[in-house]
């Protein structure tokens, strides 16, 4: 199990990203617009820099929903390989069966 604080911090980051997404996208559009004057684009970049760092999408870490493990994460199932194996063997993940040949 991952530390509870790490899992909670990541959840907080997800909510911050969701709240800041529209504002960040608008500022980035202004910054990337070559038709606008450089002063306006510079002001937008300063505003973007003043927003919280945890509002950036790259700060989110994919973690297992079951254990909180950050590595060996399957995006489609939102769980780690270990949790997938345990729940798959118990038959709790639909469509997952132990292979045999």
Swiss-Prot record:
GO terms for biological process: translation. The keyword Ribonucleoprotein applies. Gene3D superfamilies: 1.10.287.1480. Keywords: Ribonucleoprotein, Ribosomal protein, RNA-binding, rRNA-binding. PROSITE patterns: RIBOSOMAL_S14 (PS00527). Part of the 30S ribosomal subunit. Contacts proteins S3 and S10. PANTHER family: 30S RIBOSOMAL PROTEIN S14 (PTHR19836), SMALL RIBOSOMAL SUBUNIT PROTEIN US14M (PTHR19836:SF19). This is Small ribosomal subunit protein uS14.
């Amino acid at each position: 199990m991952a530390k509870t604080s790490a899992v909670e911090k990541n959840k907080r980051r997800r909510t911050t990203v969701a709240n800041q997404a529209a504002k960040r996208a608008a500022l980035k559009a202004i910054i990337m617009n070559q038709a606008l004057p450089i002063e306006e684009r510079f002001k937008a970049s300063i505003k973007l820099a003043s927003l919280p760092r945890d509002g950036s999408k790259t700060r989110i870490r994919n973690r297992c929903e079951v254990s909180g493990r950050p590595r060996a994460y399957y995006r489609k199932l939102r769980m780690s390989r270990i949790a997938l194996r345990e729940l798959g063997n118990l038959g709790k993940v639909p469509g997952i069966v132990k292979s045999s040949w």
